[in-house]
Amino acid sequence: MKKINFRNTLFAAVLLFQLNAVAASGQTVVKGSVKDNTGKPVSGVVVTDGAHFNTTDAEGNYVLNTDPARYPMVYISTPAAYELPSKEGVADGFYQYLDAGKSENQCDFVLTKRQKPVDEFVYIVLSDPQVRNEKQLDRFRTETVPDLKQTADSLKNFEIVGMGLGDLVWDAMNLYAPYRQAVSNLGMTMFQLMGNHDFNLLYKSMTQTDHPADGYGEQNYYQSFGPANYSFNIGKVHVIAMKDIDYDGNKKYTERFTPEDLDWLRKDLSYVPKGNIVFLNVHAPVANNTVAAGGNARNANALFQLLRPYQVHIFSGHTHFYENQLPAPTIYEHNIGAACGAWWAGHVNRCGAPNGYLVVQVKGDDVKWRYKATGCSPDYQFRLYQPGEFESQKDYVVANIWDWDWTYTVNWYEDGVLKGAMQAFDDEDQDYINMVKGKKTGYRTRHLFRAQPSKDAKSVKVVVKNRFGEIFTEEIKL
């Protein structure tokens, strides 16, 4: 009788059990390569499925183990030495969908080597287009889109990257296709991220779903634009897009980073040298003092701990309320005005900032920005009210300076004579009050300034100097 090797038999039984467990859980192996357009392998490229990470080896190859039911894509973080993949001007080609029915998926990527390194580029940040129906989509197409195209044309000597900060639509999954078409071929590479209105309201978010095969909130977005958490590199900047909405279904959600989101970010940043510039793009803000707990991501401190070693600009939307903050010495948040303003009700946000978007110019380590109001000159940086126009400040000239921060100086002149600094105050913006037909909503902005002219004054001039030394002037006759 042949002697039985119990150790080998036990090992084989355990292995068979593990393989069956892997198959039952939907696990698959993803293999692939990253090569340039000449067929040369690209090493050191970061590859992820949204949870697990690897890098390509010297031959440009990688391997990832994943569960495609839970992580339906594999994607790369494009290195700075290569062009950003796109299709008709919309970011594409950096991700691939997995076949959950296969035990092994092959996902290969092709990148185009830049002819020379990028030192200067333009970054355009667009928040909350939030189109709900054809009427709002038409306003976006006829107001915002031509303005974006005009701005891109004026900056055509630079490479331009665009980022939609979420709420691309307003729960209307059928508008993803026309939205994508609207932002195509604008003279930039246009990326997107998810807002609370970009989930399919019939389902919970992936992390809350026990059976993703039955449907999950991100599904339509994934099919239209790719992953929710991803990154890429351009110039000296590492750009990250993240989801900070935890969706419960049926329009219920919490502004927060899930533990899975933060773990993904920690791993992504592990490939970025400390001290580098990071652009983090999210939907809900992390430090807006006006909306506070009513709109900020709840666990922002955990985020800040990961970001502190870097020079960070956070770009956010969600509030329809413009506010700049410095939540940490190396972290500056731009919670910008919405492209739709106050939900396409008119032409201003709840703080009085006009509908528009932020134009960021990057040169090496230098980052500058200016808000671009839709349909207005790039020099239109504040709104001036005559005495009597601002209901609560009838005797004052009032300036609303939407991109204001603590480095600004705001001076005023009466009949050509310098009178000094205007007085900061907080209140609801009059343009917004007028737009909602006099109904006050309690959203008091901090970027208002006032000055009381003499009774016999003939003119008042306001001079605003921003943190970059740029000067904007407006004069009114009394």
Where are these regions (language model features)?
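Short, ordered, surface-exposed loop/turn motifs in non-cytosolic proteins
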Residues: T28-A51, P68
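N-terminal active-site segment of His-dependent metallophosphoesterases
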Residues: V29, A81-Y176, D456
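Hydrophobic beta-strand segments
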Residues: V45-D49, M73-V74, V410-W412
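Short, acidic Ser/Thr/Gly-rich low-complexity loop/linker segments typical of extracellular
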Residues: A51-D67, Q423, D429-Q430
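Extended active-site neighborhood of metal-dependent phosphoesterases/phosphodiesterases
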Residues: A80-K87, G93-Y97, M173-K274, G294-F315, ...
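Aromatic sugar-binding surface patches on proteins
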Residues: M188, E428-A451
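Short acidic, glycine-rich surface-loop motifs adjacent to enzyme active sites
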Residues: L269-T290
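Binuclear metal-dependent phosphoesterase catalytic core
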Residues: I331-W404, Y408-D415, R446-K477
